[in-house]
Amino acid sequence: MKINKLTLNERKNDILSYFGEINAPCRTSEVAEHLGVSAYQARHYLQCLEKEGKIKRSPVRRGASTLWEISSIPP
């Protein structure tokens, strides 16, 4: 039985493509559903992309869902 495991870079590229398709901020749960992974795993991938400066999270208010979006590219 072959198990298809995507690398971290493949997952991150998939997330960036997803953001490009929807062209709107989205929640961690939406990314998790798109990837078919747990919210915990999706959050890990999103945090990696955030550290790389490729995406950013919206300002978080108490009790509000975290929204993620593509970082604006400087001119």
From Swiss-Prot:
Any one GO BP annotation for this protein: regulation of DNA-templated transcription
A Pfam family that the UniProt record links to this protein: FaeA
Which species does this protein come from? Answer: Escherichia coli
- Which gene is transcribed and translated to give this protein? daaF
The protein's superkingdom reads: Bacteria
Q: Which InterPro entries match?
A: FaeA (IPR006793), WH-like_DNA-bd_sf (IPR036388), WH_DNA-bd_sf (IPR036390)
Q: What is this protein called?
A: F1845 fimbrial adhesin operon regulatory protein DaaF
What are the alphabetically sorted keywords of the record? Fimbrium biogenesis, Transcription, Transcription regulation
For this protein, the record's Gene3D superfamilies field holds: Winged helix-like DNA-binding domain superfamily/Winged helix DNA-binding domain
Q: What does this protein do?
A: May have a possible regulatory function on the expression of the other daa genes.
